Amino acid sequence: MKAPVLGMKYLPRLSAAVLALVSFAAATSARAADLPSFDKVSEGYEQVEVSDQQATKGLFNVWKRDKDSQLIGELPKNFAGKNYFIALTVSSGDLYAGLQSGDWVVQWRRYDDRLALIAPNLRTRATGDAESKASVKRLFTDTVMLDVPILAMGPNGGPVIDMDALLIGHATKFFGPSVRVSNPRINELKSAKVFPENVEIAFDIVNGGRNIDGSGKLQTIHYSFSEVPSTSGGYKPRDADERVGYFTTTYSDLSQYKDDDTQVRYINRWHLEKRDSKLSLSPPKEPIRFYVEHTAPVRYRRWIKAGVDYWNKAFEKVGIVDAIVIEYQDAQSGVHMEKDPEDVRYNFIRWLNNNIGTAIGPSRVHPETGEILDADIVLTDGWIRHFNFNYEDLMPKLAMEGFSAETLSWLGTHPTWDPRVRMAPAEQANFRRAEYARQAQQPMGGFAMAGADPALLGDDEYDGLFGSVSQKNGLCMAASGRSLDLAFARMDWGLTLMADEEAAKKKKKDDEDKADKDGEKADASKKDGDAEEDDAEEADKDDDLDDEDADDKDAKKVGDKDADDEKKEDEHLLDGMPEWFVGPLLADLVAHEVGHTLGLRHNFKASSLYTLDEINSEALKGKKTIASSVMDYTPINYRYDSGNAQGDYAMIDIGPYDFWAIEYGYTFKDKELPKILSRCTEPELQYATDEDTTGPDPLARRYDFAKDPLAYANEQMKLVKLYRERILDKFVKEGDTWGKARRGYELTLGLQTKASSMMANWVGGAFVYRDKKGDPGDRPPVEVVPADQQRAALKFVIDSAFFDEAYGLTPKLLERMSVDKWIDGGFHSSMSSEATWPIHDRILGVQASALTWLMNPTTLRRVYDNELRLPEDEDALTLPELLATINAAVWGELKKECPEGRNDRKPMISSLRRNLQREHMQRLLDLVLESSDDTAAYKPISNLARMELRTLTEDIDASLEKCGDKMDAYTKAHLSETKERIDRALEAGYTYNAASAQQPMMMFMLGKEAK
């Protein structure tokens, strides 16, 4: 009898709810009655049929009118409250056409006769009691992106909207500033396809957005609509852990009160399940299936497949066989050609012929759970065909590698320290200086992490990592970094393998020496006797003749074999490169991008697993991978003389870290997760990712190599020397333009800069580990790089950047370093480049960059702070030692004996060294006069810089007094002017630091350079 009583109790509330519902329905009907009829609105339109023959109903209905490219769509009747994906692609008219350009999670919400497109708040949630949920909902509201009018109510009861007005008129809202419809009158409906789970719509537009040359460019923009699936499909999210690198889906749960519980992070991964859970090794219920687009060259497809298949081995370790399946589109047979690469139901590997070295593996992720729903891989051919090294583009990037936001802020106010300015062509220097000064005023000094635009992927270093709940691979530079290595290979394949040739010559000489020694021993053991000696001499003569004939025959055989080998090699070239060389490089790159689609982030510590000798050894070659992961930017392993054999040029499989990461992300044994993570201290499982590359850890770097990078850097410099010796006679062939000599030299200068920049990161460095308390070994999370390693790195930078001989310049080479004079854009900036190479500007650009690496405030602060991290009785590289070492290297001529026979053609201090010295002096002045209080280290830095300047003036005085009469005019004038500027600057500096208002007077006294 109690139930009816309760029913009576709640009857008034129920009646009120029903009444409200009826009133809402009536109001909706009234609004619908005010709208035009659907028949009138859809007049002249034809419905787009569902493309799937096995289904009769699409995600929503679409009608098109071909004559004027009009498109209308009817949303589902039950659209309210549902989340939808809108995935974006610029599918033509762009160098990165086909690259997934980001996505939006949206809701439609009706307001009278208009529909608002809403970006729901997904970042802040409450999973606890009803009160906390209500509070969060009230405080953290959704965002209105745009609104459109309702044209009519459709035949299925849903609102009808103007799709072309939405997608063309608001293109910038979706794609960001890179897409702006500059002429709305010129557009065309490219395609409209309706599927059961998605709708695909593409328009040709005139784009006048950012980075578009001229008033407009025809492009195709593609929209993919799909419903965000429910969370009731059996997928179980997995917590992220900073010791293993996965992209994450993150939100704040404000119903929790512990710090560790408030921020919820799930790894992004696929929903893989065993078909038969009883089997230790079972096929998946639904594999990850990739389709290779028909545009991928047939000659490369087996290597694409190899890169994908690498990962199946890792999934077998967790009990899934054939977790990833690969299929091929084929235009000739029509196989899979009905599948649209933009269709979100299919995962595609796409190939772009855009002459740009890049690759990317973005994915679409459930915003609540981190489940990966679909993914694509875009490969380009530019890195393979890359032969034209662009000095102005790549050199500054190499020089800026590892710079932090702190350093960028400093460079913005000190442009003479900025490698991007110093390496710029003279005609662009002022523009670059102003540009970077503006960037320095932005958050984090214009650091890419702060400026990444989530609306469009592929144009910023940290794309995909910020701006949305779920991270994804928004930009990958693995292929771009490999472009420089391939450019070396394309200098001349014979040059690339010259190290093997040199090793072969050395081995031949060693064998000959051994044979000579054996012959001497044999002669000594002969019996005495004139007759026997005569017989032996005659026999030896005959033998010598026979040997000469044999040598001639052997030489001919070797020549024939070389010719046969060359012919055989030519038969297996892929676009001018041996298949055995470039094929594994492509497989390595594909494996890297597949790793991203599986949820894995970069691991920039992976290349530091083995020493260079271990990598180039028979024990490792073909048996183990050269790095612990394919998720690093590992350079091509060009050997000169390290180890006992040329090791693998690239990764030949996924590495031990990759197996471990897949085990953590995809194992079915949740109880094993802590045990899996506890292995994080093992050498092959070390991890650092994108945001770590600007920190103090020298092993967390892109493009470095080996456990002992100093050995790698020295090896690179040997290759540089070898290449430079062969530029004129080997690289530039008969009939070639002499512009190749310049390009060849600038390639070597790029490699030299890369090696020096890599080693500069070790100065002031500290190894950083992601261990947690209780992990094996009890390592401290921060461990200062041993002082001896820092000193060795410092010496390498000095030797490779400060001295003339490091650059290998000769009059014969310089007079042939011309330029190709074409105005058609065939070579970058060639029409504006002088035929005479700007020797001093180019070399000073590298020298100035080296000084910036070693003397920028961030590096000096790290050295200063490291002194306190170590016990006083432990060896450390100190700030005074660093500055004194640089000073001694830059001004070494002052300590030498007075020169004999010097004149203006043979100066005591060369022109390149005078430039370096003037630059160094100015850097010390900048540090002395710096008044910023950004860091507590500025004062001791300033004091020590002042002391170095005082020491320098004393050394200059002593040198002028001792050797002044024997100095050439260049050197004497240089030293005299340097001393005068230091004295005046230090005197003015006291006034400047006492009252900054005196700065104009200081500038007047010091001249333009002091600004």
Q: Which residues fall in each region the model found?
A:
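Soluble non-cytosolic domains of exported or imported proteins
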Residues: 261, 294, 298-306, 580-585, ...
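Sec/Tat signal peptide C-region and signal peptidase I cleavage site
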Residues: 28-32
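Bacterial N-terminal signal peptides that target proteins for export
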Residues: 2-17
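Auxiliary tRNA-acceptor-end handling modules of aminoacyl-tRNA synthetases
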Residues: 33-296, 314, 318, 329-514, ...
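Zn2+-dependent metallopeptidase catalytic core
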Residues: 80, 299-323
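Bacterial N-terminal signal peptides
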Residues: 15-26
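The catalytic-center signature of Zn2+-dependent metalloproteases
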Residues: 317, 327-355, 584-591, 596-640
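Conserved catalytic/binding loops enriched for acidic/polar residues
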Residues: 457, 461-467, 471-475, 483, ...
